[in-house]
Amino acid sequence: MNNWQEELFLKIIKREEPATILYEDDKVIAFLDKYAHTKGHFLVVPKNYSRNLFSISDEDLSYLIVKAREFALQEIKKLGATGFKLLINNEPDAEQSIFHTHVHIIPYYKK
């Protein structure tokens, strides 16, 4: 991994890297995933840096999950999705590639 990957989300938060931002408040930011698995796949990222679930504070984790659910329910309704997956990868063996805690919200649609 290089510094670009490590700092990508911080750059998005600071508007130094382009992203389609869907939601932002003082604690989290949500934006479309550049490598989406499905239409509308987005990420919710805490602004306070932590590597993953092993290091995030309980307070930041609670806020992140509540906001991820709240925003997921809102977005899947807009998209016409019939369900969604909430995913958090932790460490390389679990396919974490950007080492800043984040939640994937992946909408699913009727087949």
Curated annotation (Swiss-Prot):
GO molecular function annotation: catalytic activity
Motif Histidine triad motif in this chain: 100-104
Domain HIT intervals: 8-111
GO biological process, one term: nucleotide metabolic process
Pfam families in the cross-refs: HIT (PF01230)
InterPro entries named among the record's database cross-references: Histidine_triad_CS, Histidine_triad_HIT, HIT-like, HIT-like_sf, M_plasma_HinT
NCBIfam families in alphabetical order: M_plasma_HinT
Protein's UniProt name: Uncharacterized 13.1 kDa HIT-like protein in P37 5'region
Native organism taxonomy: Bacteria, Bacillati, Mycoplasmatota, Mycoplasmoidales, Metamycoplasmataceae
